[in-house]
UniProtKB/Swiss-Prot annotation:
Domain TrmE-type G: 216-377
GO process annotations (BP): tRNA methylation; tRNA wobble uridine modification
Source organism (scientific name): Salmonella typhi
Cofactor(s) needed: K(+)
Name the UniProt record assigns to this protein: tRNA modification GTPase MnmE
Co-factor note (free text): Binds 1 potassium ion per subunit.
Family note: Belongs to the TRAFAC class TrmE-Era-EngA-EngB-Septin-like GTPase superfamily. TrmE GTPase family.
Alphabetical list of SUPFAM superfamilies matching this protein: P-loop containing nucleoside triphosphate hydrolases, TrmE connector domain
Keywords, alphabetical: Cytoplasm, GTP-binding, Hydrolase, Magnesium, Metal-binding, Nucleotide-binding, Potassium, tRNA processing
Residues engaged in binding GTP: 226-231, 245-251, 270-273, 335-338, 358-360
Gene name of the encoded protein: mnmE
Length: 454
């Protein structure tokens, strides 16, 4: 679809509401105002007017806001019509606007896409709009707003600028081959490079925090039937999310709960008890349990403390451990400490964390909460911050790798050309975050995940 088209979409959620907003952007927005309002409102002033149908009769009345480009969100002429929030009224008004030639329904995220293409915001800021809307906690919302206001982009642009200066220095050395070795070995370039690497490491640390705020951690509770998995889900969720009985196999499907631990989103998944099942429904539930385990960030291996004294997972259930994906973190949870009399707390056993608790009474559950927060490296004391997506983390990691490769070329062979190339690739990776170097395919995937009216 052409970016020369004028687009329209509802900017408020579907359904009934006190106010419903239609947003129009493009060259024909001026014509829409003349046809629907009978005049062009004063720029950036609220004008209370009737919204007219083709025959001149009123469809609704409300507030019209006119933002002539380039001083608008999209950088184009923008008209907003704020009427009553009934779906029938909004649908009639939308159909009226679509009768005008050159006007079409907007694609998801197309308003934000046009703002990006018209340099009203960069790609990281555009993504922050969607993240702010989807924020599931106060801390996530504040971090998304920081990104929208340019905090993340400013950090990235600072790194790009530092790399630009470093590249100039290195390439100047290459232009004078008789003095290149002296330029590269005098310590100045190494010091500057180390400074950029340190700054990048700091940004990566904050970005990982931002990714946790946005994505959360997926934790799967797994174990044999009647180990107390559903009781632990309820204890972590703080409500009776799962049915708990003494009957083995009560949980036959996957149960999901979304909670927060000091601002960090946590996706807790309770699964069917793992065993050789003859019942077809239970067997399907066990298959789904393994699917969730394979996609988990961490598995809570739930153990009934009344059935074994073992603490090493390989001793408790070797077949279960052997089937787990390689490098998947495991926390052994010895449950029913209120019955066994075990000392509550956390310890380490052969590289695995071991938590002793009682899911039924809630004793020791706070220890598990703190363990989950710490195991993901979440820092509740970090001020400010910004949200980050997986693609941001990947771009930062690629940039860090190129800088390390460049440092190896500098210190190992004084190879100026190879160092310059690694610096260029690092700069390109960072520029993908803000959209300075980004493929059209990636842009399409990013903006298609937005709301229609954004």
């Amino acid at each position: 679809m052409s970016h020369n088209d004028t687009i329209v979409a509802q900017a408020t959620p579907p359904g009934r509401g006190g106010v419903g907003i239609l947003r129009i952007s493009g060259l024909k927005a001026r014509d829409v105002a003349q046809e629907v309002l009978g005049k062009l409102p004063k720029p950036r002033y609220a004008d209370y007017l009737p919204f007219k149908d083709v025959d001149g009769s009123a469809l609704d009345q409300g507030i019209a806001l006119w933002f002539p480009g380039p001083n608008s969100f999209t950088g184009e002429d923008v008209l907003e019509l704020q009427g009553h929030g009934g779906p029938v009224i909004l649908d009639l008004l939308l159909k009226r606007i679509l009768t005008l030639p050159g006007v079409r329904i907007a694609r998801p995220g197309e308003f934000s896409e046009r703002a990006f293409l018209n340099d009203k915001l960069d790609l990281a800021q555009a993504e922050a709009i969607a993240d702010l809307i989807d924020a599931s906690s106060e801390q996530a919302a504040r971090s998304a707003l920081n990104s929208l206001q340019g905090a993340f982009s400013a950090r990235v642009n600072h790194l790009v600028e530092a790399l630009t200066h470093l590249r100039i220095y290195v390439e100047a050395a290459i232009d004078f081959p008789d003095e290149e070795i002296d330029f590269l070995s005098d310590g100045k370039i190494e010091a500057q490079l180390n400074g950029v690497i340190a700054d990048l490491d700091a940004v990566r640390t904050e970005a990982r925090q931002g990714s946790l705020l946005r994505e959360g951690m997926k934790v799967v509770i797994a174990g044999r039937p009647n180990a107390g998995k559903s009781s632990l889900l309820n204890a972590l969720a703080g409500r009776e999310a799962a049915i708990v009985t003494d009957i083995a196999g009560t949980t036959r499907d996957v149960l999901r709960e979304h909670i927060h631990i000091d601002g960090m989103p946590l996706h807790i998944i309770d699964t069917a008890g793992l065993r050789d099942a003859n019942d077809e429904v239970e067997r399907i539930g066990i298959e789904r349990a393994w699917q969730e385990i394979e996609q988990a960030d961490r598995v809570l291996f739930m153990v009934d403390g009344t059935t074994t004294d073992a603490v090493d997972p390989a001793d408790i259930w070797p077949d279960f451990i052997a089937r787990l994906p390689k490098n998947l973190p495991i926390t052994v949870v010895r449950n029913k400490a209120d019955i066994t009399g075990e000392t509550l707390g956390i310890s380490e056993v052969n590289g695995h964390s071991l938590v002793r608790l009682s899911a039924r009474t809630g004793e020791g559950v706070d220890v598990l909460r703190n363990h989950l927060k710490q195991s993901m490296g979440f820092d509740t004391n970090m001020e400010g911050g910004f949200l980050a997506r997986r693609r941001h983390l990947q771009a930062l990691a690629e940039a860090a790798n190129h800088l390390e490769q460049g440092k190896a070329q500098l210190l190992g062979a004084w190879a100026g050309e190879l160092l310059a190339e690694e610096l260029r690739l690092a700069q390109q990776s960072l520029s993908e975050i803000t959209g300075e170097f980004t493929s059209d395919d990636l842009l399409g995937r990013i903006f298609s995940s937005f709301c229609i009216g954004k």
